[in-house]
Swiss-Prot record:
Matches recorded under Pfam families: FKBP_C, Trigger_C, Trigger_N
Comp. bias regions, Basic and acidic residues: 452-462
Positions of the PPIase FKBP-type domain: 163-248
Protein name, as recorded: Trigger factor
UniProt-recorded Gene Ontology molecular function terms: peptidyl-prolyl cis-trans isomerase activity
Gene name of this polypeptide: tig
Species name: Mycoplasmopsis synoviae (strain 53)
Localization: Cytoplasm
Function statement: Involved in protein export. Acts as a chaperone by maintaining the newly synthesized protein in an open conformation. Functions as a peptidyl-prolyl cis-trans isomerase.
Length: 462
């Protein structure tokens, strides 16, 4: 049983092992002896009847299946040992195929190889690192956004703009024919939410309540209804209302008269909001760069993955899909009828999603392998200043990896301009956060001193 045969393909490795008929018979006899002892025949004690009578009550096919199953499990440990010794890049996703031969059985252990990425051309990538410092305008806009969260909307006669909620009736046509699901009354839509197909919401900007007209937009190639993909649709629109958040402006009398509107409180709030924005932009800037880079690279790389691995991921995505349908109390069959799709169409979509998830993940792993930088002591010290300023007592490994990949990539691909901008940004980050922390400390000290001064004044009055 020690003769292994290895067959390699691009995505899988098959380990074949031949087990002779004699070996199978030997194992069969062992199990048969144990099984016969437990069989009862009327007129005899358990296992004491003639062997012919006992065997007549034995399911030999089930017994042989058990023998082969046992041999399969026993041999699997040896297969794993062989794979480790050969340092084969395989995953734990596998199947076992059994083939009966004239003089025995062949066990084929098929393993999914670790997915591979090739033709990774990072130097030609167009994705740029965008670094933005936090301005006073950013701080004020962020404060207003936070203040206006959850505030009610009011009808306006103005032209609709991004962020407004519009109420309208619509009816859609493809090739002059009304299409299913393309009609609604009193439909509510927040402009800029990207709830409709690309190009639809933009054409409602600048329109006032009472406007009637047509909008044309093309369904994307990935649209969930297969029959509508890449087709232009014409929508008849009746715009009934434009609703806008009854926003609270920082320079309004309403805000200035509120407890939050005092100059002292607003000044303190600005400091905390600015620090929050500085920290979030630092983290988001490098994360966005790597995410966009990975997406760009995914369009051109060659990706090799076994269907064995995809099978597990597809099953997982299929379960998520079913859970979502249950959440909305929609039966799968009814959903398929609405989107005019078959079960095969759904499986194709799930497989595409599974491949894409794996692809993005393994492209990032390749970037880690190729570009992850080992920081010098001086660079570690510099980043420690950044983390201290960010109040990160122990930054996550993910963040450290992202920073190491970012710097290594900028250096190895000769992006000197972006590398300088990144290094300057780190200096700005430390200086800005130290300045803000100093302001916060000063405010806190002032707050602790004020009650003490009040107590002194009270004693003097007495």
């Amino acid at each position: 049983m020690s003769d292994f045969k290895f067959t390699n393909t691009e995505t899988e490795l098959v380990v074949s092992l031949f087990v002779s008929k004699e070996q199978v018979d030997k194992e069969y006899q062992k199990l048969e002896t144990e099984a016969l002892k437990k069989i009862k025949v009327n007129g005899y004690r358990a296992g004491k009847a003639p062997k012919e009578a006992l065997r007549a009550r034995l399911n030999s096919k089930d017994l042989l299946d058990r023998v082969l199953q046992n041999l399969s499990k026993e041999n699997l440990n040896e297969v794993y040992k062989q794979l480790m010794e050969r340092k084969e890049p395989v995953t734990f996703a596998y199947t076992i195929d059994l083939k009966e031969k004239e003089n025995g059985f062949t066990f084929d252990y098929k393993f999914a190889k670790v997915p591979t990425v090739s033709d990774l051309d990072v130097k030609s990538a167009k994705t740029e690192l965008k670094l933005e410092k936090v301005t006073d305008k950013d701080v004020l806009e962020s404060i207003e956004t936070r203040l206006n969260e959850g505030r009610s909307r009011v009808k306006v006669e103005d032209e609709a703009k991004k962020g407004d909620e519009v109420l309208f009736d619509f009816k859609g046509y493809i090739d002059g024919e009304a299409f299913e699901g393309g009609e609604a009354e009193d439909y509510s839509l927040v402009l800029g939410s990207a709830q409709f197909i690309a190009g639809f919401e933009e054409q409602l900007l600048g329109k006032k309540a009472g406007w009637k007209g047509e909008i044309k937009a093309t369904f994307p190639s990935t649209y969930y209804v297969k029959n509508y993909r890449d087709k232009e649709a014409t929508f008849e629109i009746n715009l009934k209302e434009v609703r806008r958040v009854n926003s609270l402006k920082l320079d309004s009398k309403e805000f200035k008269d509120s407890p939050l509107g005092s100059e002292e409180y607003l000044g303190q709030y600005k400091v905390f909001v600015k620090k929050d924005l500085v920290v979030s932009r630092f983290i988001q800037s490098q994360r966005d760069f790597l995410d966009e880079l990975v997406k760009e690279l995914s369009q051109s790389v060659k990706f090799h993955i076994s269907d064995l691995l995809l099978k597990e991921k597809i099953a997982q995505l299929d379960k998520q899909f079913n859970d979502q349908l249950k959440q909305y109390k929609v039966k799968r069959k009814e959903y398929l009828e609405v989107i005019k799709a078959t079960e095969e169409d759904i499986q194709v979509e799930l497989k595409t999603s599974a491949v894409n998830e794996y692809k993005l993940s393994y492209i990032y792993q390749e970037l880690l392998k190729e570009f992850k930088k080992e920081f010098t002591e001086e660079e570690k010290k510099q980043y420690q200043e950044v983390f201290d300023a960010l109040k990160f007592t122990s930054p996550s490994n993910d963040l450290l990896d992202q920073l190491a990949v970012l710097e290594g990539l900028l250096e190895k691909t000769s992006r000197t301009k972006e590398l300088k901008a990144w290094n300057d940004y780190k200096v700005y980050l430390v200086e800005e956060l130290k300045k803000l922390d100093k302001e916060i400390q000063s405010m806190q000290e002032k707050q602790t001193q004020e009650p003490a001064e009040e107590k002194v004044e009270t004693k003097e009055e007495k």
